[in-house]
Amino acid sequence: MRVCLMIEGQESVSWEDWLALAKACEASEIEALFRSDHYLSVMGRAERSSLDAWATISALAAVTSTLRLGTLVSPVTFRHPSVLAKNVVTADHIAGGGRIEL
């Protein structure tokens, strides 16, 4: 059975939180870590910060070695398909290939 984790990253998840979470996932039986790709809180909380989804995934790819990473969706309303493709390919190269889910 695949065990994966999804986090609503736009709800004030800091880089330190992402890093600790990815390390904990990689040390456990969790195969993949997914995050939402939203710029604003879906809970209507404007004060909540949000790191960019693909920048976060690329950074996590650099500090993990087995954890699969990705988003559930990436809205084309603010991510042009060619820019999204470039972001995903970049993350895949940083990950060493084969760990990025789209």
Predicted features, each with a name:
Residues 64-72:
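Conserved catalytic cysteine-centered active-site region
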Residues 3-16, 78-102:
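Flexible, glycine-rich active-site loops centered on histidine and acidic residues
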Residues 33, 69, 100-102:
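Hydrophobic residues within beta-strands of alpha/beta enzymes
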Residues 45-47, 74-79:
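Glycine-rich "substrate-gating" loop/helix at the edge of Rossmann-like oxidoreductase active sites
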